């Protein structure tokens, strides 16, 4: 690692700052270097992308220049861009992100798509189903992105969102408040879904009263840790990454809890790891589940398993 702040020129324009930032990140083989440099410059300037490209000759003042290249050096050392800016977009919404939560990924948006489709509340924003008072659970909520996106799409839904991490729940609560859905989400500290039955009683719901249980559980195997990108392995919370030695161990207890929580006809939606589709399909072959489906993401990778609870 040889990253360091470059010599400060007398003046530095927006376009020159981007050029120099990209070059420094590329020297350290940072993925998506141009995007990272853009986001960090936007953050340092307090401006959006449109402003940056509309003002390429704008000169950075010394304090902004110093902050920007400090951020570039931190990103070059492996710190995720989202931890430096404190933000990540998900489902068109801006989420606060800290090292206490998994950074929301674009592929997790497929969980929202499948959930809405399985509930009959899909792409038509005017669908009467979107006004139904759905009862939902988001297990392992992290930043709250799944629960908050669902609450944003379904204005009468009420959601119980769980996480083992008190620090993650604090981030999720702030995100819920940011998006004006805090009154419809109960945040509960517990491991996976093990305490969700108790949580449902404490928030006034009966067991088997949920219309949906959604989760992006930790599904990476411990044996895969060394192969993860440095920014993931060193900077994201282990409890949100690893689901056991193989990464598939997390699904059996989660599916068992879902069977106890979902009402007849209720829907289970789970994000899948790269090697977990066959294992999850096998678990959902058990009595009690019907309409089992695997949905691929845009890259053609099995990404989401869904099923319906029968009587």
Located regions from the model:
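Non-catalytic nucleic-acid substrate-recognition regions in nucleic-acid-modifying enzymes
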Residues: 1-33
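Conserved AdoMet
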Residues: 2, 34-35, 39-118
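Residue-level signal for inorganic ion chemistry
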Residues: 40, 78, 108, 146, ...
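Conserved SAM/SAH cofactor-binding pocket of Class I
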Residues: 109-227
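Class I S-adenosylmethionine-dependent transferase superfamily signal
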Residues: 115, 150, 232, 254-258
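Helix-to-beta-strand junctions that scaffold the AdoMet/dcAdoMet cofactor pocket
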Residues: 181, 236, 262-264
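Mobile active-site "lid"/loop adjacent to the S-adenosyl-L-methionine
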Residues: 219-250
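Conserved Class I SAM-dependent methyltransferase catalytic core
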Residues: 245-308
């Amino acid at each position: 690692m040889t990253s360091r702040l470059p010599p400060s020129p007398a003046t530095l324009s927006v376009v020159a700052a981007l050029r120099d930032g990209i070059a420094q990140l590329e020297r350290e083989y940072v993925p998506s270097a141009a995007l990272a440099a853009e986001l960090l410059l936007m953050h340092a300037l307090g401006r959006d992308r449109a402003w940056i490209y509309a003002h390429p000759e704008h000169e950075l003042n010394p304090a902004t220049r110093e902050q920007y290249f400090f951020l570039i050096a931190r990103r070059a050392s492996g710190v995720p861009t989202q931890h430096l800016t404190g933000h990540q977009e998900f489902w068109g919404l801006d989420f606060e992100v800290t090292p206490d939560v998994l950074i929301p990924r674009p592929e997790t948006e497929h969980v929202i798509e499948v959930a809405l489709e399985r509930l009959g509340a899909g792409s038509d924003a005017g669908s009467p189903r979107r006004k139904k008072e759905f009862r939902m659970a988001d297990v392992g909520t992290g930043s709250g992105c799944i629960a908050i996106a669902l609450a944003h799409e379904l204005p009468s839904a009420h959601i119980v969102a769980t996480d083992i991490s008190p620090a993650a729940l604090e981030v999720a609560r702030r995100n819920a408040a940011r998006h004006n859905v805090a009154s419809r989400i109960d945040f509960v500290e517990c491991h996976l879904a093990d305490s969700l039955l108790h949580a449902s009683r404490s928030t006034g719901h009966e067991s088997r009263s949920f219309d949906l249980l959604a989760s992006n559980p930790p599904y990476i195997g411990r044996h895969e840790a060394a192969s993860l990108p440095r920014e993931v392995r060193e900077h994201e919370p282990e409890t949100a990454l690893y689901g056991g030695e193989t990464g598939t161990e997390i699904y059996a207890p989660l599916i068992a809890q879902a069977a106890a929580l979902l009402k007849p006809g209720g829907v289970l939606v789970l994000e899948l790891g790269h090697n977990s589709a066959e294992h999850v399909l096998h678990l959902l072959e058990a009595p009690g589940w019907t309409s089992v489906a695997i949905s691929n993401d845009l890259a053609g990778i099995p990404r989401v398993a869904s099923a319906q609870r029968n009587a």
